Amino acid sequence: MRPDSVPAAKPYHLQRVDDFKKRIGNEYLTLSCRESNIAPDTLVMLDKQYVQELNASNPAWTVLFERAVTQSLIKQYTNSVSTYSSAIELNPSNPFLYLNRSTTRAEMIDFISSIDNSYQRITIDSDPANRLNNNSKRTYSYDEAVADLNKAVKLFPDFAYAYYNRANLLALSGSLPEAFEDYTKAISLNPAFAEAYYNRGIIQLCMKDTRKGGLDLSKAGELGITEAYEVLKRYASLDN
């Protein structure tokens, strides 16, 4: 199978995101679902720099945010969550603080649960439903992370990534219909959101709606996620 020929997608842009990045004023700051490519030594150096700034004067929420980010990236999750909470106390109406605290809380759960191997991510598999079923044995809860995203959505209802992140956590918690709704909302806000199409497709396969799931995976492939075509091939082979 080959990706269909489609017009270039219009980039998803929100002025509020740009304004936030400008307010922080950090060249390293970016909105991304990928792993950071900043060297560990650089992260440690930046973290020490933020500590010095915080000790030298009254804490600014912007510096607290920056330190919370570096703490998260060096896997000091508890300290990171605490630092985000301090930033939120100073700026409780900023949705990006809740978004990042949610992400850190989820990463902390993922890290802890990976130690006892009782947790599985949604990923490409011959039977994605089996992956989700494995989560029933997991005792960890994403409730606090979801609560942060509820707050972020309330403060910034046009932010597709908040719905997408919440959908991921709902899916991993086994709330597939609710996850489907959030993926759909994210797609309505950002029609070129390839990852949302992909994950919604997987969710629909898990809910046994193979036709609509296949359509979403095909769309994800058109938008650049070539792995979606591999999932389609696997399901086609299972049906034959």
Per-region residue spans from a language model:
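Conserved structural position within tetratricopeptide repeats
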Residues: 52-55, 86-89, 147-154, 184-188, ...
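Conserved alpha-helical positions within TPR/SEL1-like repeat arrays
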Residues: 65-72, 96-107, 161-171, 183, ...
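Residue-level recognition of tetratricopeptide repeat
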Residues: 60, 94, 159, 193, ...
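Register position in tetratricopeptide repeats
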Residues: 73, 107-111, 138, 172, ...
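Short coil/linker segments at helix-helix boundaries
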Residues: 107-148
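Hydrophobic/aromatic packing residues within the alpha-helices of TPR/SEL1-like helical repeat arrays
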Residues: 43-50, 84, 142, 149, ...
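Terminal, low-structured helical/coil segments at or just beyond the last alpha-helical repeat
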Residues: 206, 210-240
